[in-house]
Design a protein with these regions (language model features):
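Signature of N-terminal electron-transfer/Fe-S-associated modules in redox systems
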Residues: 1-163
């Protein structure tokens, strides 16, 4: 059997759990997470790394999983949208999206939320400009971004109150 036709084991941590995935050498991480790990919250929008719908965190960095060969996940720590909330409550960003109507059709929502969570982890009280820059890799065709932006601003207030 040719090398490219054989699946290879990929060991990584996904949402806090040690995981072994099996993937063909050029399988996209997006597909492996959705189909093999059952983590369907991560969406495919464009499939070209332009829209951010497929965003995940890998070792703390926001990456487009539609462009990432699954083999590159070896030894990494990955967080998908399913790993953002804890067992008892939503993350402040998720709660703010609910309260402020930051989601409509839902395709961009997981990537937007992960981008905002990633931004707040690095910069708990970002300026408006930093929020816009933090969300710049994510496209939305429904909301016009106002509700998304308001949601992130509200999440910043929520994290400030808890600090």
């Amino acid at each position: 059997m040719p090398e490219a036709a054989r699946k290879i084991r990929v060991r990584c941590v996904v949402n806090g759990r040690a995981t072994t995935l099996e993937a063909y050498p050029m399988a996209r991480l997006l597909d492996v997470l959705r189909e093999q790990a059952g983590l369907t919250g991560t969406k495919e929008g464009c499939g070209e790394g332009e829209c951010g719908a497929c965003s995940i965190e890998m070792d703390g960095a926001l990456v487009n999983s539609c462009l990432m060969p699954a083999l590159q996940a070896e030894g990494t720590s990955i967080r998908t949208i399913e790993g953002v909330a804890d067992d008892t409550r939503l993350h402040a960003v998720q709660q703010a999206f609910l309260m402020h109507g930051g989601a409509q059709c839902g395709i961009c929502t997981p990537g937007m939320i992960l981008a905002a969570v990633n931004l707040l982890a690095r910069k708990p009280q970002p300026t408006e400009s930093e929020i816009r820059e933090g969300l710049a890799g994510n496209l939305c065709r429904c909301t016009g971004y106002i509700k998304i932006f308001e949601s992130v601003v509200e999440a910043c207030r929520g994290t400030e109150k808890r600090a």
